Amino acid sequence: MAKDYSRTQRIGDQMQRELSFLIQREIKDPRLGMITVTAVEVARDLSHAKVFITVMGKEDSADEIERNLEILHEAAGFLRMQLGKSMKLRSVPQLHFSYDASVRRGVELSALIERAVAEDRLHTGKGEE
């Protein structure tokens, strides 16, 4: 019987929860925006973890995203140390932060769909009169 939920997935999910907490509570950099950890992909050998983040609010410009990624890269050592303490792993993966644009794309697509539906209602309303 194959495992439906592998160890790397479980570790990735736990890392996502722990990193969300640590970024919100432990990083005291005032330049850091409202960061949401959307996913963590852990390599099979647990040597690397790709952490996907979004930046909420007005910080949606490319410069703000880059600045937030730089801050997180600078704090990666501290975050690894804290993860090691809280998760009790023998070796904590190297953290690589990436911006997850899927949330922004989803919002843009929703707006396009809503606009198309509104225009369709407007056109069908004129056709019936």
From Swiss-Prot:
GO CC terms: cytosol
Leader sequence residues: none
GO biological process: maturation of SSU-rRNA
Membrane-spanning segments: none
Gene name linked to the record: rbfA
GO molecular function: ribosomal small subunit binding
Cytoplasm as UniProt keyword: yes
Official protein name in the record: Ribosome-binding factor A
Entries under Pfam families matching the protein: RBFA (PF02033)
Keywords in alphabetical order: Cytoplasm, Ribosome biogenesis
Primary site of residence: cytoplasm
Subunit and interaction comment: Monomer. Binds 30S ribosomal subunits, but not 50S ribosomal subunits or 70S ribosomes.
Alphabetized PROSITE patterns for the sequence: RBFA
Biological role stated in the UniProt entry: One of several proteins that assist in the late maturation steps of the functional core of the 30S ribosomal subunit. Associates with free 30S ribosomal subunits (but not with 30S subunits that are part of 70S ribosomes or polysomes). Required for efficient processing of 16S rRNA. May interact with the 5'-terminal helix region of 16S rRNA.
Subcellular location: Cytoplasm
Domain of life: Bacteria
Gene3D superfamilies cross-referenced by the UniProt entry: 3.30.300.20
Family: Belongs to the RbfA family.
